[in-house]
Amino acid sequence: MIPVYAQEHDFSSCRVLAVDDIPLNLVLVKKMLSRFNFQMETASGGQEALDSIARSKPDLILLDLMMPGIDGFEVIRRLRANPDTADIRIVILTALTSGEDVSKGFNMGANDYIMKPIIMERLLTSVVTQLSMVQSAKAQ
């Protein structure tokens, strides 16, 4: 069931990219967010995410940190260093729970940090908040 506050928004013009190297995590995130009408894509790693972003810039990225090759921290660093992608909203979804990791994520430019296992209400609240900010910025 989608909370009332989430039902009040039309996110049909928004693009969301979920990035995780574990396919089941991508399936779960897609299922949790399936009632929203935004366009959702997935990537199975950092390089695939960067390639997808280069083709079509998303409004929001749901990003795992621990991935082989290019990890989530490096994805954030590259996105924030590029003026064309520096404004993309990023929500970290990770099993890394130390205060150091949380601080590092925010210091690198993440907009929110959600620890796994993901609680659906927490994810919905974050997605609604981030996409509402995107829509407000586009309206100005």
Predicted regions and their residues:
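A Lys-centered signature of the CheY-like receiver
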Residues: K116-P117
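Short, glycine/charged-rich "phosphate-handling" switch motifs in NTP-dependent
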Residues: N111
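Non-catalytic signal-transmission and effector/linker regions of two-component phosphorelay proteins
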Residues: M1-R15, K30, E121-Q140
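Charged docking surfaces used in two-component/phosphorelay signaling
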Residues: V27-R35
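Acidic, metal-coordinating helix/loop segments flanking the phosphotransfer/catalytic sites
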Residues: T42-L60
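Receiver (REC) domain active-site loop signature in two-component systems and cognate sites
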Residues: M67
